[in-house]
Amino acid sequence: MKEIKTKKGRRRRKKKNRQRYRIGSIAFGILFLSCALFLIISYGKQKQAEREYTSLRSEEPCVTVGQIAMRTGIAAVSAAEKEEIPHSDAPHLENTIDFSALQEKNADIYAWIQIPGTLVDYPVLQHPTDRLYYLNHTIDGTAGLPGSIYSEAIHPKDFSAPMTVLYGHNMRNDTMFGSLHDYEDPDKLTDAPYVYIYLPDKTLIYQIFAAVRFSDTYLPDYCDYEKESDFMTFVKVLCSSPGNINETVEVPYGSRLLMMSTCIGNAPNNRFLVGAVLIDEYEK
């Protein structure tokens, strides 16, 4: 009698184990399919955003990599202009951005950044209230990667502050600010030294002087950039950080800095900063 009960008990346990196994397999399958679906949707959104940015670049005929010496739209710098701005040998590129058309797509677009010699060639956005909105929203408002190139509302849109920070994701395919990591090669600072910021009424030219690993401190609160001692201390700390420095570029007090910030894949508590100083500006 005991043997019969024991056999029945074993059968019940086996049956329960099989049920648990089936339930576990079904749950795992649902989880796997959910993850796969999420990845597919995320990848689709990312590719759609990349197509949107590519479309914008094709609509806005900025000078692209490899065309600087050929494009007839490049304005030659005259001798008189060089006398007015003796420190700038950067070519004046034609500002052909149609900001009216861009702002019909998104009113938060206020500038365009281009770094000839890299893949950086994007609109710049600023949300009026949510400083992190464009970290995870594309220009059409879609949530998720690759986000946008953006600044925070603390920074004037005419880049008149002593220090302006632009943020962008470090994408694996080098889009957004991913190609800033090219400046880990010291030769890149001289091969691709200029940053162009196109505004509705003028163009700003910056020269890159630093590409370093920095802490993830919130740069706008790092110091009072209006004070000479604070400004020069920041420049000194920046140029003492691990990375590459172009020591031929002067960064005196009173300069206007552009800091481009992106993440470092294996260092979540650090940021890769590319620092540039304003060397020229001209009307559109």
Regions found by a protein language model. Name each.
Residues 32-284:
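Solvent-exposed, non-transmembrane regions of membrane-associated and secreted proteins
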Residues 1-20:
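N-terminal Lys/Arg-rich, disordered targeting/topogenic segments
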Residues 22-33:
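Hydrophobic H-region at the start of alpha-helical membrane spans
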